[in-house]
Structures are given as C-alpha cells and as structure tokens.
Amino acid sequence: IAGVTRQAFYYHFPDVMSLATWVFEREIVTHIMAHATYREWSDGFCELLVYMSEHREQTYAVVSSLSRSEIEEFFYRAFREMMRAIINELEGTTPLDPAQRDFIIDHFTLSVVAHLFHWLNRDMQADPYILTENIEVIMRGSVATALDRYSTDAPPPLIRREGTH
C-alpha cells in the first residue's frame, strides 16, 4: 500500500502505534498553527476538540501510548507556538522585557493546555462549543491587557504577610 515497503516503514517507525502517534501529532500541530491568530484561535481550538471527540478512540490510543510528560510537552509546545504568534500579532511595537513576554506566553498557553487536559481527563464530557466559548470569554481582551500592563507598569509587588517568606 502507498508504495512503502515493510523494511522502509520499520526503518522510520518501530511499530504502527508510532506511526499513528506521528500522524496525530502532525495533524494537531498543523491545525493549531492554521488558526494561530487572535481572531481565529478559539474557532481552531473548538474544531480541534470536535475532531478529537469524533476520533475519540484514536485520540485516547495515542494519548495513552505516550507518557504523561510526553503528551503534556507535546501540547505545551504546540499551543505555545500558537500563543507566541498571537502575542506577536497583538504586541506590535509594545516594549516588553523578554522574560515578561515569555511569562505572558506561558501563562496563556498553560491555561489553554490545562483546559484541554481537564476535558480529556473527564472523558470529553464537556461540550466542545460551550467549553471553548467559556475559555474565550475569559481570555477575550486579557492578552492585550496583560501586554499593556507589563509594558506600562512594573508588575505589582507581592504583598507579603508577617511570618511568610
């Protein structure tokens, strides 16, 4: 099939599950980056959840074939690239310290990834459309606000209470 010999297949993939994982990862990354704009990210995220729920068996097969840290790192990297593109789009000429910029990217990346994992851990029970809408409502304007806060003001100091370090 497809002109690939068994020897060539096993040269690149030790087993069929490795191939399935590779295909899954490529499709996910391509999909995420195709919607890596402030205007489109939530539509893309919703489509991703719908895709994963429509391909539930394959999704859980791939997710369970990887270690927890591998799957977390995969989604973190993919969504971080999306968030980096969104920050690039929104920041314009806003002067940001690189460490603060990275913190903003990480914060919003981790928020989306945490919701994705919570949804997967709850057996995809939440409706993808409602979940995405709820995330989008909370995040709408928050990224631009974070950029503005970090560009014009120093982050507020932490309030330390007596007896804390």
Please tell me what each predicted stretch does.
Residues 23-31, 55, 59, 82-90, ...:
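A short secondary-structure junction motif
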Residues 42-57, 106, 110, 114, ...:
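Amphipathic alpha-helical segments that line or abut small-molecule/effector binding pockets
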Residues 88, 118-165:
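C-terminal peripheral helix-coil segments that are non-catalytic and often amphipathic
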Residues 6, 37-53, 140-143, 148, ...:
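Primarily secretory-pathway and cell-envelope proteins
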Residues 27-34, 51, 107, 111-122:
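Solvent-exposed, amphipathic alpha-helical segments
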Residues 46-51, 55-82:
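Helix-turn-helix/homeodomain-like alpha-helical modules used for DNA recognition
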Residues 3-6, 10-36, 46, 53:
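An amphipathic alpha-helix adjacent to DNA-recognition modules
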Residues 68-93, 99-114, 144:
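Amphipathic alpha-helical packing segments from all-alpha helical-bundle domains
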